[in-house]
Amino acid sequence: MKLTAEDKHNVKAIWDHVKGHEEAIGAEALYRMFCCMPTTRIYFPAKDLSERSSYLHSHGKKVVGALTNAVAHIDDIDTAFSKLSDKHAEELMVDPANFPKLAHNILVVLGIHLKPHFTYSVHRSVDKFLSTVAYVLASKYR
């Protein structure tokens, strides 16, 4: 899915509001995913995935940090996510069907917390961006 100039502008603009809140946004998105889609928990055996766990917050910060990197390299997400895609495919062996699930939950959290800035056009652009990231992450599985 090709991001238009407007999409790129919208994603960068909304991401300015994400900065400084990476941990909270990431943790809430992960927690929502684990609660609503419990099969996604299988990749985190013996980890505390409760809402306030330090592991969940640390991993959430890492996830949103990776997305911040994708925003910074929005014209070449393939290259920016190449190593991360390799890791998820070869080392972690995460089912690529889970990437869109997390993308959906990130979209929900952004919509809740950034409501005044999360217009319909921003929603569409961020959805396309997260879908692109999910596609790139799954690309090494082929």
Curated annotation (Swiss-Prot):
Red blood cells. The keyword Lyase does not apply. O2 binds at residue 59. Disulfide bonds: none annotated. GO terms for cellular component: blood microparticle; haptoglobin-hemoglobin complex; hemoglobin complex. Keywords: Heme, Iron, Metal-binding, Oxygen transport, Transport. GO terms for molecular function: haptoglobin binding; heme binding; metal ion binding; organic acid binding; oxygen binding; oxygen carrier activity; peroxidase activity. Signal peptide: none annotated. Residues 2-142 form the Globin domain. One of its GO terms (biological process) is hydrogen peroxide catabolic process. Heme b binds at residue 88. The keyword Kinase does not apply. Pfam families: Globin (PF00042). Belongs to the globin family. Major hemoglobin is a heterotetramer of two alpha-1 chains and two beta-1 chains. PANTHER family: HEMOGLOBIN FAMILY MEMBER, HEMOGLOBIN SUBUNIT ALPHA. Involved in oxygen transport from the lung to the various peripheral tissues. This is Hemoglobin subunit alpha-1. It comes from Pleurodeles waltl.
